[in-house]
């Protein structure tokens, strides 16, 4: 049996097919891998010095303490103890501080398992920026292995935090230390044969990079630097104009591993 197609049937079908092919060519979904960078932030942020994750310090016994499964390998009974909260879902990480010894030290429970025996210690130094106060700081950033739940699977990434000051022995005040996220995320978006560097910055110091107040940056002038004018808060970054007449949607559901861009 022979079928005959009329022009009225063929031409509209061809037009629809061409339109579909054109739209598919113009629309693409791209997975952008992210990598942690632990140098200074991508641009100088105007963040107040006292802003960060504030962790209260309390003197505590290190033996027989449910929060300390194994204490550091030093001969002391009492140390300062603090807790920081990072990751998604939030997880508690302990810190122990000794400012009574010849060397002032802080131990970080990097993986949150309450075992300080094998953990790295960082030396603290007294700051002269606050006369009359016992203020210490760490010149080395503190490392935490922060965990995230992505699509039902656990993902762990090292995140570094600066310790700009630790204040103790203030009459009538709580002792505390302050942590500021040093690590940021970098990646490269490919759009119309061009490579656009991108970055994500943790602005609330919880080791996450996809909170509404965190920042998403694109180096749109290709000067290999990020500026504050190239930053937008995550809550405003679901839909962006990448280039003139080119718009896209960004899915931050897999941060810090990757973002998914549809354009």
Set out the residue ranges of the language-model regions.
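Short, low-complexity, intrinsically disordered N-terminal modules
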Residues: 3, 21-24
């Amino acid at each position: 049996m022979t079928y005959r197609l009329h022009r009225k049937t063929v031409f509209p079908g061809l037009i629809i097919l061409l339109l579909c092919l054109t739209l598919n060519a113009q629309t693409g979904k791209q997975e952008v891998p992210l990598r942690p960078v632990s140098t200074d932030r991508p641009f100088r942020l105007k963040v107040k010095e006292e802003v960060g994750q504030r962790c209260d310090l309390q003197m505590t016994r290190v033996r027989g303490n449910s929060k300390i499964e194994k204490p550091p390998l030093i001969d002391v009974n009492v140390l300062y103890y603090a807790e920081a909260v990072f990751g998604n879902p939030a997880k508690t990480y302990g810190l122990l501080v000794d400012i009574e010894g010849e060397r002032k030290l802080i131990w970080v429970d990097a993986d949150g398992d309450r075992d300080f025996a094998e953990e790295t210690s960082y030396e603290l130094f007294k700051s002269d920026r606050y006369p009359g106060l016992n203020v210490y700081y760490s010149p080395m950033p503190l490392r935490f292995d922060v965990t995230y739940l992505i699509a039902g699977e656990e993902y762990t990434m090292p995140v570094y935090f600066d310790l700009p000051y630790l204040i103790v022995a203030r009459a009538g005040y709580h002792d505390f230390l302050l942590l500021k996220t040093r690590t940021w995320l970098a990646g490269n978006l490919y759009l119309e044969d061009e490579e656009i560097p991108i970055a994500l910055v943790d602005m609330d110091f919880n080791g996450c990079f996809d909170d509404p107040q965190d920042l998403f940056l694109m180096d749109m002038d290709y000067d290999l630097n990020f500026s504050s004018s190239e930053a937008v808060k995550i809550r405003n970054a679901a839909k962006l104009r990448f280039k003139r007449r080119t718009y896209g949607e960004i899915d931050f559901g897999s941060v810090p591993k990757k973002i998914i861009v549809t354009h």
